[in-house]
């Protein structure tokens, strides 16, 4: 039995712990200053709470650093004497692999990951950076298998993490922004808030499911399948084009990417 430990058990750390807990041959432990967080995870996935960060480092085979970026240095330096033979994983945005290795005194291999919030419901995407030259093939296979089992996972060089961050890490914020707009227009059209919200969410989920179930069909074809010549749907699509919706979405992600590059600069 292998042990996966997380220092930080908030939304993202908790989501990953919950996913790992479902896998065979893994048990989960964690520490968070907020006892309510570890209590909730104990009920949800059987997490065993630790008294502090050092206990996690001592007992876990794989240690997830799931704290805010400004706290990473202090946490990693604190547990550094206990990392021999361990595998360190960091999800802190903007904290480079080089910095993680420096904080740990290069006492163990490290992996940088970039998940997104749908991981909280088992529908996440995750980028893995396996650039650390001290990672052996067995460790790479272990971490890739682990995260592939709980999310849609891609392996990227660290230089490409900002692209993933802007596109996929921040992507849920943009989807929810669009979802809010659909709910708002539902209200304007006379639906109750409950119905507008429920229908808008199902619209998003159902449309994506249709695309996933028909991988050979281009998205443009699926769009045109909704639009009849001279009908109302094509008028709406043309209005989106007139307003530059496609370009606005592209520029939104590119602006996010520029900021992600700034944050990743050492």
Predicted regions, residues:
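NAD(P)+-binding Rossmann beta1-loop-alpha1 motif at the extreme N-terminus of oxidoreductases
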Residues: 1-59, 103, 123-124, 185-189
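Glycine-rich beta-alpha junction loops
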Residues: 34, 93-95, 115-119, 168, ...
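Internal alpha-helical scaffold of NAD(P)-dependent oxidoreductase catalytic cores
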Residues: 99-109, 125-164, 175-214, 259-260
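NAD(P)-dependent Rossmann-like dehydrogenase/reductase catalytic/cofactor-binding core
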Residues: 201-266
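Rossmann-like NAD(P)(H) cofactor-binding subdomain of soluble oxidoreductases
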Residues: 20, 29, 45, 53-128
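A short glycine-threonine-serine/GTX helix/turn-capping micro-motif
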Residues: 165-173, 223
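Small-residue helix-packing motif on alpha-helices
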Residues: 38, 56, 72, 192-200, ...
């Amino acid at each position: 039995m292998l042990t996966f430990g997380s220092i930080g058990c908030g939304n993202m750390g908790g989501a990953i712990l919950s996913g790992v807990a479902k896998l065979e041959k893994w048990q989960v432990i964690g520490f968070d200053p907020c006892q309510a967080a570890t209590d909730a995870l104990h009920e949800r996935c059987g997490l065993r709470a630790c008294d502090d960060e050092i206990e996690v480092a001592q007992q876990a085979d794989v240690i997830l650093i799931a704290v805010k970026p400004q706290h990473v240095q202090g946490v990693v330096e604190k547990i550094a004497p206990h990392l021999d033979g361990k595998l360190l994983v960091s999800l802190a945005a903007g904290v480079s692999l080089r910095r993680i290795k420096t904080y740990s005194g290069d006492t163990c291999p490290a992996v940088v990951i970039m998940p997104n919030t749908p991981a909280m419901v088992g529908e996440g995407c995750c980028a893995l950076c396996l650039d650390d030259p001290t990672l052996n093939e067995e460790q790479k296979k272990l971490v890739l298998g682990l995260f592939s089992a709980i999310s849609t996972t891609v392996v990227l060089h660290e230089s490409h993490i900002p692209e993933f961050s802007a596109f996929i890490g921040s992507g849920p914020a943009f989807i929810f922004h669009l979802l809010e707009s659909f709910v708002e227009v539902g209200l304007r059209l006379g639906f109750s808030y409950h119905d507008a919200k429920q229908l808008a969410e199902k619209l998003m989920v159902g449309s994506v499911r249709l695309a996933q179930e028909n991988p050979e069909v281009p998205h443009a074809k699926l769009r045109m399948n909704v639009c009849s010549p001279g009908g109302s749907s094509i008028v709406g699509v043309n209005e989106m084009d007139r307003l530059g919706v496609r370009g606005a979405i592209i520029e939104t992600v590119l602006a996010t990417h520029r900021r992600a590059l700034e944050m990743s600069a050492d």
